[in-house]
Structure formats: structure tokens, C-alpha cells
Amino acid sequence: MLVGFIHGVMNTDNTTISGETIDYGPCAFMDVFDPATVFSSIDERGRYAYGNQPQILQWNLARLAEALLPLFDDNSDAAVEAATEVLSGFTAAYERHWADGMAAKLGIAAPDRALAEDVLKLMRLQTVDFTRFFRALSAGTARTLFTEPEPFDAWAARREALLPADRAAVAAAMDRANPVYIPRNHRVEEALAAATDGEMGPFRRLADVVSRPFQERPGLEDYAGPAPVSRTPYVTYCGT
């Protein structure tokens, strides 16, 4: 969630008991921030949209709990009560980790949920690229990403009051939390198309770029940039 990753088909058989997702077929990374972002061709109703993923994971956990109920207690009511108690803690645990992660991305010392949610709303309303925004924020150039910067200016003033004194250290810490490179969808398609034709160079190049996602390197500006404007939405498939 903190890097804009969308699994695509995050159902129960693609979620392991260890809490990890698997089977990355139609997965993709979000460009412009929008909680409703869906790429998978089979997700017609947006069940596994970016913003739904936390709730989907909780739902998957509930299905696991149902399968384990006989092991919790011989009394079915007691078993359900025990499972419900554990599952009820998911939302608070997720939100705590999300808030901590957003604080690191924003460079503030302590989580501020309102500050984080407000800037995400601005990004959605003004179609700002999710990954580029946070790197631009640490570089002091985020204002240029907004077509109407005044709301961002007001938000930035609130953030300014929460920043630690050592701004250079803040920027360095933010760059350790915010990737400059992600597997941009158009780059993935480029690599797939070339590999299909027997040319592995673009894949190896992309793999090298994203293997060090936080380290900005000269000559890789095209890999940090947004996807070209497309007339048709990007679609992924289970075979991808």
C-alpha cells in the first residue's frame, strides 16, 4: 500500500498463512494516485482495487479462521467468539502500521493521519503521480506536480510545522522510504514484448533498475518518469 502496489487477484488462494500474497499474474504499480485503481482484466467490479486491499486481506483472514474453527474450541459458539476477537484487531493493527509508514514517507517525526489523508485527497483530485510525489517532496519540488498548487501550499505549511529541525536528514530518510524507481507498467510491457521476440536486454535493464529502487542514478531518468498519456487504460492479465 505504501508503494502503490496492486495485486490484482488478491483472493484466498493467493494469500499465504504467513500473511504474504503470491501468484503475481495481473499485478501492477499505480501511477496517478486513485484508490479505485484496477488493472486486472477479470476484476470488472473493482473488488481488488488498490484501496480495497486491506479489507480484502481481513476478509481472507476471516475465511482462514472459519476453516480453523474446530481447532479453536469444541464449543462452536466459543470458537467463533475466539476467532472474532482476534480478527477484530486487524483494522487497528493495519492502520497503525500504515500511519507509521506514511509518517516516514512524509518525513514527519510522528504519525499524523489527517495530514496523510489530506495530501492523498489532493493527489487524487489533481491526478498526481503517487511515486513521483514523495520523491519530489523530499527534493522540495512537489508543488510543480499540482495544476492548482494553492491547496498544496496550505497543506505544505501544516507539514512544515511538524518537520524535525535537520532538514537534510529528513530528506535523506524520506529517500530511504520512497522509491524513485518502480516497475512502471509501460516499461514492463516493453520488456515483455522484447522478451517475446527473444530480446532480453530491456528486461535485464529494468530488473537492474528496480533492484535498487531507492538509489537515484544518472541516466535512468526515463525509468523514474510517469507513463505516457494513453487513450486506453492499462490492463493486466493472469498470464502477464
Language model region names:
Residues F39, E44-T240:
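Regulatory N- and C-terminal appendages and interdomain linkers associated
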Residues L2-H7, N11-P70:
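Catalytic activation segment of kinase domains across protein kinase-like and atypical kinase folds
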